[in-house]
Amino acid sequence: MIRVLHSVSNMDRAGIETMLMNYYRHMDREKVQFDFLCNKTKPGAYDSEIESLGGRIFRTPGLNPIKYPKYLAYMKELFRKYPEYKIVEAHNGALGVYALHAAKLNNIENRIFHAHGASITKDWKLPLKLICKSRLKANINYQYSCGIAAAECYFGKDTVVNGDFELIPNAIEVEKFLFNSDTRNKLRSKYNLKNKHVVGHVGRFMAQKNHTFLLDVFAEYAKTDADARLVLLGDGKLMNSIKSKAKELSIADKILFVGNVGNANEWYSAFDLFVLPSIWEGLPVVGVEAQAADLPCIFSTAVTKEIGLS
């Protein structure tokens, strides 16, 4: 059996992690197994399912550069204890070089960087991320990407022109997202959304997803439509500040914060419109899911045109 070690933040319900689970559930796990190298100590929503499917979950000391020697020692012991690993695939942006460099030092043959974002978040970690990005090519021998824009961001335009990378589509289980009128009626009844015009968004509460702008736009729309409602799925460190902004804009009574739930697929049937105002994306899984539900979609210009499905 081949075991692939995936470096991730943690296995919560987010785009990258959900994409991995979509593949994991449907592959022949007698031949290939996925294991997950998580860089956060917090348990993930998918942990129990992963273990039930035969996967392993490891938790590193984290990606603090001050603790890098400790990280390398952890990885050295992991590879000593589990010598079967021949493939390491990193999904956590430029910081994925941590796992890939450790893999190279321990003579792991196949080291894959999987690009998911078309930009690098400009936060306080930006200098570290840029250093890590500059070290990627020295530590990998395979380049994967969810789309062209993400490939250009991490590998450069020449790599894209020369086709020197593998395009891995963000696949979904289409049947789970098809429109269902019974599901629509159930959710809209439960959450007092009957006869309302429901705008939906699915995404982690972080700067990239641009919730602040979304609320500003919705506040203007709500002035013209008393039945307008905004439903937000997801959680994250900015949720409380977004709730405060909703109160400031006097639209808190028109917004439903659903949280991080296991039935996000059902919510697409309850929406009338899907919006994704992200500042940057690779090829967002939620955009594919919304189109599978036959929803009208509004994407920001930062979202790659590759997202458009016929």
Labelled PLM ranges:
Residues 2, 6-70, 164, 237-238:
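N-terminal strand-loop element at the rim of the active site
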Residues 14-22, 197, 201-220, 237-243:
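A conserved mid-protein helix/loop that constitutes part of the nucleotide-sugar donor-binding site
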Residues 75, 178-192:
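A short helix/loop element that forms part of the nucleotide-sugar donor recognition site in Leloir-type
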Residues 90-96, 115:
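Short His-centered aromatic/hydrophobic patch
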Residues 140-179:
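A short, active-site helix/loop in glycosyltransferases that binds the activated sugar's phosphate group
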Residues 243-259:
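Nucleotide-activated donor-binding/catalytic signature segment of Leloir-type glycosyltransferases, i.e.
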Residues 260, 279:
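Aromatic "clamp/platform" in nucleotide-sugar-dependent glycosyltransferases that forms part
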